[in-house]
UniProtKB/Swiss-Prot annotation:
Gene: clpS
Protein name, entry field: ATP-dependent Clp protease adapter protein ClpS
Subunit structure: Binds to the N-terminal domain of the chaperone ClpA.
Organism from which the protein derives: Rhodococcus jostii (strain RHA1)
Family that this chain belongs to: Belongs to the ClpS family.
InterPro entries recorded: ClpS, ClpS_core, Ribosomal_bL12_C/ClpS-like
Role played: Involved in the modulation of the specificity of the ClpAP-mediated ATP-dependent protein degradation.
A biological-process GO annotation: proteolysis
Superkingdom classification of source: Bacteria
């Protein structure tokens, strides 16, 4: 009876040059996404009056009446407007303040 070995011979499987794995590529893409600033988006709603939204933009963000009115009109005509940007913590705080004032606001990474 012949002797049978169950162990395979050692094969040097090291590639000649380093290779990039998909996991490394994904990490780079995620890091680039995290480098983008966050923005606060205010959405149109059927409840708040236009002059109230203008007032809130002035009070919370220090916008002039003209700038606050411009942003309010953008919300009214386009359905949304970006009203602030910055770090995630800052934008989360801005969204919280807008919610406390009764406005519909969300946050997202800046698309530009």
């Amino acid at each position: 009876m012949a002797h049978c070995s169950t162990t395979a011979p050692f094969v040097d499987a090291m590639p000649a040059s380093p290779q990039v794995t998909p996991a490394e590529s994904e990490v780079v893409e995620i890091d680039e996404a995290n480098d983008r600033p966050w923005v606060t988006v205010v959405w149109d709603d059927p409840v708040n009056l236009m002059h109230y939204v203008t007032y809130i933009f002035q009070k919370l963000f220090g916008y002039s009446k003209a700038k606050a009115t411009e942003l309010m009109m953008q919300v009214h005509s386009e359905g949304k407007a970006v009203v602030s940007s910055g770090s995630r913590d800052k934008v989360e705080n801005d969204v919280r303040k807008l919610h406390a004032a009764g406005l519909w606001a969300t946050m997202q990474h800046d698309g530009s």
